[in-house]
């Protein structure tokens, strides 16, 4: 029986694992392959991309961070801008749950696009009742 596929929002945690070829990178790669084939849509909020950029810059240097963002822009991932609707949703999430503000943007994006969040960040356990989580 074929598993039904869901659209996904890639959280910074999952993308960083992919960038650094850590545990869970293969799952992210498989989702990107599914997105390339048109089986699913993959999203990332631009706030989370900014988070990825500064973390990658700190850990691996500016050159690597820039190269990774350049490479990431070629992947089948739709960037989602922080529209007013998403900003308000993220702010409401932040007011109610002890999540980082950037994580709230991932949740707001998943709610807007009715998508599953792909992450390994245990902080998301606090909102499992609101959105589906694909743990990597």
Please identify what each model-predicted range represents.
Residues 14-15, 48, 86, 106, ...:
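Alpha-helix capping/helix-boundary segments
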Residues 16, 50-53, 91:
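Amphipathic alpha-helical segments within well-ordered protein domains
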Residues 78-118:
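Active-site neighborhoods of divalent-metal-dependent phosphate/nucleic-acid chemistry enzymes
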Residues 1-44, 57-70, 134-136:
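Short, well-structured N-terminal submotif of metal-dependent ribonuclease cores
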Residues 1-7, 107-136:
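Acidic, PIN/NYN-like endoribonuclease modules and their adjacent C-terminal/linker elements
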């Amino acid at each position: 029986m074929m598993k039904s596929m869901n659209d996904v929002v890639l959280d910074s945690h999952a993308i960083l694992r992919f960038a650094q070829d850590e545990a869970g990178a293969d799952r992210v790669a498989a989702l990107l392959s599914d997105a390339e084939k048109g089986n699913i849509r993959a999203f990332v909020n631009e706030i989370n991309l900014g988070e990825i950029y500064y973390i990658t810059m700190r850990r691996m240097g500016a050159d690597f961070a820039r190269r990774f963002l350049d490479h990431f822009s070629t992947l089948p991932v739709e960037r989602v801008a922080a529209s007013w609707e998403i900003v308000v949703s993220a702010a409401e999430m932040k007011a109610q749950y002890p999540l980082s503000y950037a994580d709230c943007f991932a949740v707001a994006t998943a709610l807007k696009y009715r998508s599953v969040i792909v992450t390994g960040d245990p902080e998301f356990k606090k909102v499992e009742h609101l959105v589906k989580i694909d743990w990597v």
